[in-house]
From Swiss-Prot:
Keyword ATP-binding in annotation: yes
The name this protein goes by in its record: ATP-dependent dethiobiotin synthetase BioD
Molecular-function GO term, any one: ATP binding
Localization: Cytoplasm
Cofactor requirement: Mg(2+)
Pfam families in UniProt: AAA_26 (PF13500)
Pathway: Cofactor biosynthesis; biotin biosynthesis; biotin from 7,8-diaminononanoate: step 1/2
PANTHER family: DETHIOBIOTIN SYNTHETASE
Taxonomic lineage: Bacteria, Pseudomonadati, Myxococcota, Myxococcia, Myxococcales
Protein source organism: Anaeromyxobacter dehalogenans (strain 2CP-C)
EC category: ligase
Gene Ontology cellular component annotations, sorted alphabetically: cytosol
Residues that, per the record, bind substrate: 41
Length: 223
């Protein structure tokens, strides 16, 4: 399977917008890429869900249930959200859905929920999913204070499991003036021996931000 697994150091770090930007950039370059969200939970009514955003970035070529096999109401990790509804997530079903997309498209960008060790099923985490898919992992991290620890821990967890790392992207998700931002990339590189691929700038205009992310990521990430 060709593609990427997009994980985060936390929830709310911008995984979905990075995954969407990657899909759009790949498609603009002529690569038939499609996004996938194995499980989503806690969708806010009146706003597009992560899966809907990925479907739109993918050109709307797949039905929503192919993009996202599991949807839950409660804003919880997938395993907990499934339990709350008397349901269970199957890793095998998610892998089968990803392989089905890979059979129809040249590349699949899979966006996890939360961070790497967030429980996906009653027994497996998103790290187990990344391993089962065999995709290199792109780590999306916040750019500001606290990211050094979160990013180093995520990289360590990936390395301990022998999972390939496609890179680290630091993402500014707001206009806050944080004096740690210019320093964090170098500190992460020192601790992990991995230079972050990009520091994505903050842009309040959603359309311009999407274009900016796409251009930066297209130049840095190949899959």
């Amino acid at each position: 399977m060709r593609g990427l697994f997009v994980t985060g150091t936390d929830t709310g770090v911008g995984k979905t917008e990075v995954a969407c930007a990657l899909v759009r950039a790949a498609r603009a370059a002529g690569l038939d890429a499609v996004g996938m969200k194995p499980a989503q939970s806690g969708h806010v009514a009146g706003e597009p869900s992560d899966a809907e955003r990925l479907r739109e970035a993918s050109g709307g070529v797949e039905p929503l249930e192919a993009i996202c096999p599991y949807t839950f109401a409660a804003p919880l990790a997938p395993a907990a959200a499934a339990r709350a509804e008397g349901r269970e997530v199957s890793l095998a079903r998610v892998v089968e859905a990803a392989r089905a997309l890979a059979a129809r498209h040249a590349a699949v960008v899979v966006e996890g929920a939360g961070g790497l060790l967030v429980p996906l099923t009653a027994r497996e985490t998103h790290a187990d999913l990344a391993a089962a898919l065999g995709l290199p992992v792109l780590v999306v991290a916040r750019a500001g204070l606290g990211t050094v620890n979160h990013t180093a821990l995520t990289v360590e967890a990936l390395e301990r499991r022998g999972l390939p790392i496609a890179g680290i992207v630091l993402n500014r998700t707001g206009p806050e003036d944080d004096p740690s931002v210019p320093l964090n990339a170098a500190e992460i590189a020192r601790l992990t021996h991995r230079e972050p691929l990009a520091l994505l700038p903050w842009e309040p205009d959603i359309a311009r931000r999407a274009r900016a992310l796409g251009s930066v990521l297209a130049a840095k990430i190949q899959f």
